[in-house]
């Protein structure tokens, strides 16, 4: 089964992606990982990509698509794969379609922006140990202090409210057209159209996981 899993920062996509891959025995593949692996292995596509990157240019969709084809030919993709961060644009989605790279499912884990902002902006971290807290969902015993050392907790820059809002806006700008594209395609009844679902991303990890499994098995 080939799956595209989409979700805003803080929607819990990473947790669910790991579970899907383990359950279906498929690899999670990203364009970044594919690029690094191809460059390191000095494949023809990797050599071409390295020339482009060394020149300070963006890797073209043509090269990205060649990497995807190369990766899908690997033995561990025989049962399918889960795409992480690809496609990012309608042009890339169209390229997949035109090259007859079939997809089984496109799924978005949907969480309202307000909920994501609360999730992320409430995080606090004890830097030296990596212990994490949340001001609402998992507060420390003493406000602002690590439970074990009593040292101050910090809010990472990525978790500051304005930063979260900017990241969400970028996600919506990039992904909304892509979601609409796959949603509309799924309704055409075309035999090569993937199924499409928007999964409610609130509740426990197990509840969200069950919604995903129910959708995949429907």
From Swiss-Prot:
From the UniProt entry, list the residue stretches annotated as the region NMP: 30-59
Residues that bind ATP: 10-15, 123, 132-133, 203
**Catalytic activity, per the record?**
AMP + ATP = 2 ADP
LID: region residues: 122-159
Q: Which Pfam families match?
A: ADK, ADK_lid
What's the chief localization of this chain? cytoplasm
Residues that hold AMP according to the record? 31, 36, 57-59, 85-88, 92, 156, 167
Q: What is its subcellular localisation? A: Cytoplasm
**Where does it sit, as one GO cellular component term?**
cytoplasm
- Which pathway does the record list? Purine metabolism; AMP biosynthesis via salvage pathway; AMP from ADP: step 1/1
Q: Which molecular function terms from Gene Ontology are attached?
A: adenylate kinase activity; ATP binding
Give the EC number(s) under which this enzyme is classified. Answer: 2.7.4.3
Sorted alphabetically, the keyword list is: ATP-binding, Cytoplasm, Kinase, Nucleotide biosynthesis, Nucleotide-binding, Transferase
- PANTHER family with a match to the protein in the record: NUCLEOTIDE KINASE
Q: What's noted about domains in the record?
A: Consists of three domains, a large central CORE domain and two small peripheral domains, NMPbind and LID, which undergo movements during catalysis. The LID domain closes over the site of phosphoryl transfer upon ATP binding. Assembling and dissambling the active center during each catalytic cycle provides an effective means to prevent ATP hydrolysis.
Question: What does the subunit comment say?
Answer: Monomer.
Family indicated by similarity: Belongs to the adenylate kinase family.
State what this protein does: Catalyzes the reversible transfer of the terminal phosphate group between ATP and AMP. Plays an important role in cellular energy homeostasis and in adenine nucleotide metabolism.
Its protein name is Adenylate kinase
Q: Which organism is it from?
A: Chlorobium phaeobacteroides (strain DSM 266 / SMG 266 / 2430)
